[in-house]
Amino acid sequence: MKLQNKPHTVRDIIVVGFALFAMFFGAGNVIFPPYLGVEAGPEWLGGFSAYFIADIGLAMCAVFALLRVGSSEAVTARLGKVPAAILMSALILCIGPMVAIPRTAATTFEMAIVPNISGVSSVVFSIIFFAIILFLCIRQSAVVDIVGAVLTPLLLIGLAVIIIKGVATPLGEIALTPNADNVILGGIKAGYQTMDALAALPFGIIILQSAASKGYTTNGQKFKIVSGSAILAGVLLLGVYMGLCYLGATVSTQYGLEIGRAELVMAIVEALLGKAGMIIFGVVVGLACVTTAIGLTSSAAAYFTELCSEKVPYKAFVIVICVFSAVASNLGLDRIVSIAAPVLDIVYPPALVVIFISLIIPKANDYVSRGAALGAVGASILCAFKVPAMENLPLYDMGLYWILPAVVFGLLAFGLAAVVKPKKKSEAEAKI
């Protein structure tokens, strides 16, 4: 088939790459790197590198795993139809309407509205916020273009103003020694706990749909535009995160680890740019949250539309998600996180397992995938119930306790497959 938009390939990569950057760059990603800079002090570059690999490195692995097998559904399909549907639905709900989408509104209200505008009701704000999300998401084919071509450039301008000012006129000297005991471990742990790799699966749904709508229909064409966009998004995230981490390092003699992450960022911005800086920061937080909310709402609606075989239209799911998220956002940010954190802790490890298997050994048999995922989810459930023995597992302190059980169960499943398949074959031959 002829590539319909071939003359615009570079433009499409830029627009889709900008959109992918903005979807990953939520408000939480604004506050993590500066705090890491305070923790690391003179070792901020090493801490940042560990953070970036564990955060965006994992997310990019998820994007390329998705590209390798063709779709988000194909990544989890090797688990079996029902387990795959349960895992993806739990994942979409947790990083969608149950947690991350309402959190975007709650974060915008607490970090952008309250410091700059007094007397605004959180209920009124949430209605306005999700009315905007509804308006921007209702046309599925336009979502990526709206985010990539309109909102992301504004977000990047706001971030550039803050970072360039902080680099040109540092707020202080970097501390001589780190404030944290193990900077690399802290960076890995912080990056892993952002769970951005999970978002890559639902974001992949709308990114691939956008590529198809632009005329990129073959696997090779989709790989070209999405891989190029992912690399661009990764480079932008690298620059922004590094800049924010450096800003934190420049105040490592002024603040200790007792300061809150959001409080630290607001203090840095106000010291750099004064009251005008707080307005700019409010715009940055608002845009970061809006773009992430758009991506999550659209991808969740697209997933559930496909799950029910389009018996319920995309627009209906967008409306339901926006209404539910508006209500949930008024429960308060801390309560939202506390409700869904245990569920996320359980679904994250098996999701990473199938992502890595799809990326590294895509031809692995389904027994291996199911066994490894079973080991990971079993370990996650035991940790959720705080079983003391789990603390003895390797990498427990980093939250990677599930790796050993996943490997062991995957190998056991591989051995089982080697025994079962020849047995079935011999039984079939005997019948002949």
Model-derived segments and spans:
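Select transmembrane alpha-helical segments in multipass membrane proteins
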Residues: T9-L20, L45, K81-C94, V123-I128, ...
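Hydrophobic, membrane-embedded alpha-helices of multi-pass small-molecule transporters
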Residues: V15-F25, I163-L171, A180-L247, I280-C289, ...
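Helix-loop-helix connectors at the membrane interface of multi-pass transporters/channels
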Residues: L36, T104-S121, A212-S213, A293-V320
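Selective recognition of specific alpha-helical transmembrane segments in multi-pass small-molecule
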Residues: G57, C61, L154-K165, G228-S252, ...
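Membrane-water interface regions at transmembrane-helix termini and the short interhelical loops
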Residues: L67-A74, F130-L151, S213-Y216, A326-S338, ...
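TM-loop-TM module centered on a large, flexible mid-protein loop between adjacent transmembrane helices
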Residues: E73-A77, V240-V290, E306, P342-L344
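Membrane-interface loop-to-helix entry segments
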Residues: C137-G166, A340-L352, G371-V377
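Hydrophobic, small-residue-rich membrane helices and short re-entrant helix-turn-helix hairpins
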Residues: R139-V150, I184-G187, I207-L236, T253-M266, ...
